[in-house]
Amino acid sequence: MHNRKGVKVLTLDDFDLDSKTVFLRMDMNCPIDPETGEILGTKRIEEAIVTLESLKDAKVVIASHQGRVGNNEYKGMNKHAEVLEKLMGREIKYVEDTIGESAQNAIKNLQKGEILLLDNLRLCAEENYEFTPENAAKTIMVSRLSKLFDICVLDSFPSAHRSHPSIVGFAQKLPSCAGRIVEREVRNLDEMMTVAKAPHVIILGGSKVPDRLEAIKLLIQNGRADHVLLTGLIGNVFMRAQARIKSPLGIKNEDEVVAKAHSLIGDYPDVFATPVDIAIDRDGERVEMDVREISKGDKIFDLGPKTVEYYSKLISGAGTVFISGPAGFFEKEDFKYGTSEMLNAVANSMATTIVSGGHLTTALKQQGLADKINHISTAGGALVLYLTGEKLPMIKSLEDAAEKHRAK
């Protein structure tokens, strides 16, 4: 496999995998119902199957994370094992450990053709921090586990923009290649970007604001964003930067984040579109209002109909549309409207379309719109950054691993 710059990356087809013990970094991070703790969408788990089938003669150890420390999606991986077992119709071994003695013994005892899923990688403190590849290789996680494996397969494209030990560390120590998901994503995205037409409309939502701000700037600078339509928490940040929301949003480093949004608006005043009306939750009921009517303490849960109409017109005139992140609290029935209507507008446009992120792919499936989209990716932030032309840490690790392999 070659990336868009012609650099060779090894794939599963470059290795003899028979009876090899494989470290398989997947991304099974799924949307979780905040009230029940149940998995809402299994798309990322389903996608893992094509790679697992290619590894049918190996001893496979799946490593993934779920949520972030401190949020309500931070869970163990036992339910993921149950879902995968049901999807594949076969036993999936599970160990409630990541790098300890139980995990190590489970890996050592694995037989040819068996699959083992480790617990949430972020239970290991090191996995919550970014490292250079060289330092990642020195972490306890990589030092302890790498000696148990023959090959590292990196297939967690949604996490490819992170420099975590499991993503960049093992490739320093082991022969490494891309899995089928990464192979497909890179090939399809590179093909699409060669034919993408202006105007480019980017619709951004969700809650991962700091990552988005830098990506927005790069997308604009690289000619990938003629219009940026803002929804979700990032939309609130930009409305706060415009002084259209008076009350603090209660997010980490809010002053710094809002200042960056304000700077972007100043540098690119004709690019950004923010909501004109919204919906809040008032005593358990959906209440729609003009943005100017927002009171202190009101929490924005969705877009209003005027914003949907405004954004839909911009989408209908686009040559290329990219949407990432829900427009609101779509898990709640009363606040699905904005996300649903944005996806309808994208699906019914004549543009080349890309839908990105675990939450949106779940919503897209629920609405039966998947067949109308050119490319669907469970990656969110990684895909946004890839479209800017920036080198993703995972891809760089795979390139370096390929160079080492060829040098032997």
Where are each of the predicted segments found?
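Active-site loop-to-helix "anion-binding N-cap" substructures in soluble metabolic enzymes
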Residues: M1-K408
